[in-house]
Amino acid sequence: MKRERATRCATIALVVTVTLGVAGCDNESGVNTGKPAVSIPALPGVSAPTTTTSSKPVAAPVDFTRLLLQARDVSTTGDAYIAQPATPNPDSRPGAEVLIVNQEQTKAVSILLVALDSPAAGPSALAEAQASLTKSVNPGPPQPSIVGTGGTVVSGNSPDGAKSVTVLLFTEGSALARVEFDGLPGRPADADFVTNVGQKQAIALRVGLPAPQGTP
């Protein structure tokens, strides 16, 4: 009995030694699974990747490039557009961006989609996006739009006067959309065209984004 007890005690001591040794190796390697990843600067409510130790299943990240409009969605009779390759996660922000230019290269539509943490983050994200518009346009008074949630349109010329600029901002679910229409100076995009393109993008987001957690 004394020999069996001594054997069990030796085994326990060995397990403790090995466990402490493994923990020591983790510390030496610099791995610290208890700290989150560094946050990425972004708009308020914009998702940023972090590490987690939760055992709950994690939803796959959304591929926003497949939710962007294509050239055929913007083209009209007698005015065909061509899309450049889409950019995933521009400026390290979850989302996507694409530039669509007409064949005469006199008009362009650029679409930026940015993921939000939740629909509740929409108002603050819209406010921040609207505040930054002066970098690309000398806007007139903002006008409400029927597109999405919080839809707002501003129109004017670029700061250098080289082109007309109309920007539509709105949110749809957990995403912010910024749709910019560029054209010749003094010839802003037609209001119906802006609304039509915006509604198509809102529908693409509504259909393609996963339902918020807790939604049946």
Where are the regions a protein language model picked out?
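Short, surface-exposed beta-strand/loop micro-motifs that present aromatic residues
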Residues: 95-102, 164-172
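A short acidic/glycine-rich loop-to-helix N-cap element
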Residues: 179-196
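A short acidic-to-branched-hydrophobic micro-motif
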Residues: 96-126
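C-terminal motif of bacterial Sec signal peptides marking the signal peptidase cleavage site
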Residues: 20-24
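Bacterial N-terminal signal peptides that target proteins for export
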Residues: 2-13
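N-terminal "mature-domain start" segment
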Residues: 26-98, 191-198, 202-216
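Short Gly/Thr-rich strand-loop-strand
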Residues: 75-89, 123-168, 203-216
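Short, well-ordered beta-strand elements
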Residues: 110-112, 174-183
